[in-house]
Amino acid sequence: MLCLYFTLLPLGASAAGLAHDMSVSVLAESGEIVAEDTIHVDRKRAVFEFILNAGYAVRAVDGTLHVIATSDDGLRTAYRVTLQTATDALKLHYQGKPRFSEHIPPGGMPQGIVSSDGVYLDASSAWYPLFDRDFDSLNMVVKLPDGWQSVSIGRRLDDGDRVSWSTERPHDELYLIAGRFFRHARQHRDIELSVWLLEDDPLLADRYLALMGDYTDHYSRLIGDYPYAKFAVVENRWQTGFGMPSFTLLGSQVLRLPFIPYTSLPHEILHNWWGNGVWVDYASGNWSEGLTAYMADHWMQERQGKAEQYRLKALQRYSNFAAAGHDLPLLAFTSRHNDASQSIGYSKSLMVFHMLRNELGDKAFIEGLRRLWQQHRFTRIGFDQALHAIIGDDEQLMVRYRTWLQRTGAPRLRIDSIEVRPQPLGYHLAITITQDQDGPFDFVLPIAVTLEGRPVAKVFQARIDRAKQTLEFDLPQRPLRIDIDPAYDVPRLLDASEQPPALNRLFGGAAWLVLPGAAPAAVHDAWMRLAAQWQARYPGLRTIEDHDAAMLNPTADRLILGWDNALLTGASALFERDDQTLKSRGADIGSETFSADTSSIVLVNSSREGLTTGFIGADRPDAIAMLARKLPHYGSYGRLVFDNASGAAQVKDTLTPRYPALSRQLVDTPTPLRLPSRDELSAD
């Protein structure tokens, strides 16, 4: 991160003992920071080495300061301080305009900022002295322009004329955020809950404050006590979703979305245990994103009875992105930087944790979560260590699960044969399962068998560890239906027949965007801009004009753009469903009729052979621009309708697959699948 080619002088082997006692003044108009920092260490020494932002003028009290090196980008400098007498406290003065990277990542938020608009500082800019270890305690007094407030890690102490931040917890990074905030706070048990807004909105603040305590209570019961003195939601003018120790930084638009208190909020609160409580050793795999997604995002869906669909979408993302040539082992995942990496570090990872929960049972899984917290809080661990803590002493199980971390890919399952024969006390069932990928995985596969006279299927848990395996069952009644992994409990590559028609099937592969050659110039240009934006995000996408589309391979996936598209007439029958009809300038969906004059319509179809065809109906440049922005966030849907004027979603449907190959009816009369109910993950 620091791009400096040397190693800092170690401060000692002790696991504790580095503390900052700081005073920081923000000179917003000039963009300067003025600071004094006394760094306390656990043993006396005569030489200290540290890294600090190169924009500062630095002075060491009672010591001689030498520059060791400056980073290639000129942003950070490494210093050595030599003292005449060994001491356990180094006092530094530094002042100046911090230098920040000129690279602006997607979303537009700079690396750091000190201006009249506000302050954002984190360790990436070395705005405070960085040593060779994390710090164990902090006391920081912050002096700001009139009317400003600050947010940082730890507990807020307001003495009237000054505000300070203090913590006795170990931390790996120090943040300073400041600006003209409106603060709303309430006490929940021993935790201060607060919302910091750039524009005052008491109702919005109350919406968050009303839920925070419930979430901290839930995770405290499940894992262990909440580790910090506060939790704060802080508004950011850039559209971020960052989780820091004891607070989250949410973009102003993000913050006001009605679903965020029920999705992002529990996710960011849980990160105070996973990621900001137990830290991630990124060189050994980022386990925290998958575990947090599982225990927050998946849990919220579980509470609503929608966990099965959530897991299906997770497998869709993994099958469509990572499996399309963009895969990597979980041990190699560090952070999300595109849809493919998200499908691995979030989707596949959470499915591995879900599979482990099913194999251990909820009681043992929760005990493992508590063990992970108790053994590793405020230490840095990789994926293997995290998994080992949850699994415990079962070394054979750990060996099996370690393979899931080390390998790319996932099982691709196929039913080879099913044999049913009567026997004196019922029926004998034999199912032959094949793993089609290179090299078998070792896992437990749920197999649901619906029996005559029983409304709810019986679910067997079968150990699978070979490329081809026959599973045999003695049943008391006649089997009517077989479903392999019907609730999507195993991290696997979905068969094409299982995949619901969805935009992600087009985004994740090598689909063709078919442009409407006869569209008016302004409309055609809008489609070209959409194509360029999507190709930057999804490198597999290619473009072709509709009058050239006859040269496409008949098996090529395609997305037909525009009501004027020459391919629409021949393809409209593909989009026929029992509740759906595509017309020349609109569509009937359920009991409603949508017109191209007022709505933009998105439909996706998948054939029995796995060919995916999509259609986007829009003919206004502003509506096309709206779809270019929105649709990448709706990848799991196969049917969408947006109001052209407001951009609001009028329809967003997840469609069911038509030809699931891992489900077999064994009798002439179709039998519905009903699975046993499940409990949500809870310590209660």
Residue ranges and their predicted role:
Residues 35, 130-266, 294-297:
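Hydrophobic helix-coil surface modules that form long, contiguous segments used
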Residues 53-110, 464-478, 489:
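A surface-exposed beta-strand-loop module
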Residues 57-62, 397-400, 411-485:
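Beta-strand-rich binding/interaction modules
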Residues 134, 249-311, 369, 383:
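Zinc-dependent metallopeptidase catalytic helix centered on the HExxH motif
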Residues 168, 259, 283, 289-355, ...:
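Acidic/His/Gly-enriched intrinsically disordered linker/tail segments
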Residues 342-429:
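Amphipathic alpha-helical substructures
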